[in-house]
């Protein structure tokens, strides 16, 4: 069975439709997106900022049978930058408490 390594800063609780709970504690290793401003200029009075994104803490794809959990922003940026993301997932269908705070997710999703 495959294992999941949580590369986010928060512990993650997955609650399936059947009520089964799976806890994915943060691994202490974080994969995140960083942004660099490359230039700022104007077009017809509108400020334009050219930016580039970078991924810090990319997991070693050679780890056999390992699956990784990152944020949606990180997953989408990795895909856009051409990283292989077959073994990288993000929380989906968030669960919220009465005050609207995210307390878990119903599933993990990946980009295919």
Task: State the predicted function of each range.
Residues 2-13, 18-112:
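Intrinsically disordered, low-complexity segments enriched in small/polar residues
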């Amino acid at each position: 069975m495959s294992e999941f390594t949580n590369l986010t800063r928060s512990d993650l609780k997955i609650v399936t439709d059947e009520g089964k709970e799976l806890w994915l504690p943060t691994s202490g290793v974080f994969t995140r997106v960083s942004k660099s401003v490359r230039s700022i200029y104007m077009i017809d009075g509108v400020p334009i900022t050219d930016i580039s994104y970078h991924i810090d803490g990319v997991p070693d794809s050679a780890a056999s049978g390992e699956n990784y959990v990152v944020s949606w922003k990180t997953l989408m940026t990795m895909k856009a930058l051409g990283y292989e993301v077959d073994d990288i997932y993000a929380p989906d269908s968030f669960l919220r408490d009465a005050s609207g705070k995210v307390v878990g997710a119903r599933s993990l999703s990946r980009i295919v």
